[in-house]
């Protein structure tokens, strides 16, 4: 069974409490459960890791190399600033889908550019919690095409 590693970045542990008008009322646990269910329906395993620390996320990407078939990453604001995370994702040997609950292009200008997008197979943004299911589906399709 292929493994997807789902990574959640800074402040995502506060989902459901922090800015619900932007991020919705669903908690991170709600979104992870939705992703796990979507993965199970597609015959995939899913492992989740959340950290508020850039280095820990980089370590998680490194640990996924050779073990996971794909990454789904919601790096939060690190998506716009972390060249180190960009480099780690670039070194990962499977498809990566970048995920955002909100649509960064419709928000503040500093959110309009993602440093992860150039090393991701695709970006899913603006669909709220549904994005987690869409990201797993995208990864499943990418893995299917790779086999």
Spans of features found by a protein language model:
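Extreme N-terminal starter segment of soluble prokaryotic enzymes
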Residues: 1-4
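Glycine- and acidic-residue-enriched helix-capping/strand-helix junction motifs
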Residues: 15-30
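Short, glycine-/small-residue-rich phosphate/pyrophosphate-handling segment
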Residues: 47-48, 97, 106-147
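Short, electropositive alpha-helical surface patch
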Residues: 56-71
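Short, hinge-like loop/turn segments at secondary-structure boundaries
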Residues: 64-66, 90-91, 113-118
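Mid-chain, well-packed structural core segment of small domains
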Residues: 68-105
